[in-house]
């Protein structure tokens, strides 16, 4: 099977590439070069003929992991380009191919943030044009996935690294409940979804998470206990965002129906991550 990974140098994209490349022919799509990357087959969107190169590759599966979260005060146009225009541009370009386009979306409601809004708009546009495309479109409503060596701007990683270095952690009330999914479990979920693509309709949405919601407080306390940290945890000193979502949890019935099963508990996953990052 031929798989194109959009956003191949990102946290999720790079791990998907490593996970699939031993069993499939994998090519990555990236905006700019990364000298530290170990991925060999890359199409760069800075090249004039990057669309033509995708068509020449003739992927069976396209996984879009490209995302702009707006965490670094990026303008709205940056989020629109990354979260809407890029996936729709690729989807339209492969309209003649019998390929499956898997878009990594979010479980967050569109009024939560501009990121969530633009991600949802991409799916709405895809639904409007999917009848003109030979293949399929699958939207993944991803919950909060995490793993070793994710970006410093990710909540899960920030807490781990501050606890490892015994730095104070300033947070909101911590009463929000989130569905945390370990990256290794997410990769096997992708495997199950790809193995069952023929059973899905032309446009389809799947919720992807652990199926268990825990509070931010419980997550932070678990990290602190495993790291044996001396960090001072300050709940309630950070103001909650406007439209803060207080509960989010995936309904994983469909994932379980196609054979997926979560393997790592929160404690097991965090123990593994902390061992890797603490070396």
Curated annotation (Swiss-Prot):
Protein name, entry field: CDP-paratose synthase
Cross-referenced InterPro entries: Epimerase_deHydtase, Lipid_A_modif_metabolic_enz, NAD(P)-bd_dom_sf
Keywords: Lipopolysaccharide biosynthesis, NADP, Oxidoreductase
Gene: rfbS
EC class name: oxidoreductase
Protein family per UniProt: Belongs to the NAD(P)-dependent epimerase/dehydratase family.
Enzyme active site: 115
Catalyzed reaction equations: CDP-alpha-D-paratose + NADP(+) = CDP-4-dehydro-3,6-dideoxy-alpha-D-glucose + NADPH + H(+)
Lineage of producing organism: Bacteria, Pseudomonadati, Pseudomonadota, Gammaproteobacteria, Enterobacterales
Entry EC number(s): 1.1.1.342
Pathway membership: Nucleotide-sugar biosynthesis; CDP-3,6-dideoxy-D-mannose biosynthesis; CDP-3,6-dideoxy-D-mannose from CTP and alpha-D-glucose 1-phosphate: step 4/5
Note: The functional difference between abequose synthase and paratose synthase lies in the side of the pyranose ring from which the keto group on carbon 4 is attacked in the reduction of CDP-4-keto-3,6-dideoxy-D-glucose.
